[in-house]
Amino acid sequence: MTDAELARAVADEAGVLLLAIRADGGETGKALGARGDAEANQLIIDRLRAARPADFILSEESVDDRARCAARRVWIVDPLDGTREYAEGLDDWAVHVGLAIDGRPHTAAVALPALAQVYATDDGPRFHPVLHPPRMVVSRTRAPDIARRVGEALGATLIPMGSAGAKAMAVVDGRADIYLHDGGQYEWDNCAPAAVALAAGLHASRIDGSPLIYNCEDPLLPDLLICRQELADTVLKAIADAR
């Protein structure tokens, strides 16, 4: 099984588990989110350790083993991206299973279980025409000011949406053209989405245009831009002007 096949299978299985937990009805609200996080995390860790015992794992829901910093291959996972959306019965939450090699986003899968979708790096490039005005996905609950300013400068239509994975995949599958975040994220929030976006032929970088670097000692990675390649220069200039 290739790394991409493994990422896809694990993300899909974790998504099936999360749907079953939510359908069970035993918990609601924060308790539901906590149970989903914990059980999906354990499943992902168990599957990755069984299939790739020499690799390290960085997960939002597990104790960080800093020995990973010296490793070439590190799986970076978020078992439930969008806990609020999951607990509220919405569909814009995700499972992230990403592999960074030498600090770069390499292989990944992002599952949107409530939509029965799994996106992976072995899907290959996707090409969608940019609509005018361009469409920008922003946080439903806490859209950063810079995203609003950039959206205004570009004349973009803003589309509120939940989790980071859901927003990134909206760009991957052509439902949006730009995803800009500057409100604080960690490596597990965007490693898998960035890898899938890059494999799909999109632009993915920090908001200053610099590369996304993973497996750092401090996993804080506070900003992200995913957009159509043909929009990248325009969006980066609008970001610089808005800061």
Task: Show where each model-derived region lies.
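Short, low-complexity, intrinsically disordered N-terminal peptides in bacterial proteins
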Residues: 1-9, 123, 129-131, 237-243
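N-terminal subdomain of lithium-sensitive/metallo-dependent phosphomonoesterases centered on the IMPase/IPPase/PAP
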Residues: 1-80, 149
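Residue-level signal for inorganic ion chemistry
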Residues: 14, 18, 48, 83, ...
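Short loop/edge segments at beta-strand edges and connector loops
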Residues: 59-61, 122, 162, 208
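Solvent-exposed alpha-helices and their adjacent loops that cap or buttress functional pockets
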Residues: 67-69, 88, 128-131, 215-219
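DPxDG-like acidic metal-binding loop motif
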Residues: 68-123
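An extended, acidic
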Residues: 131-243
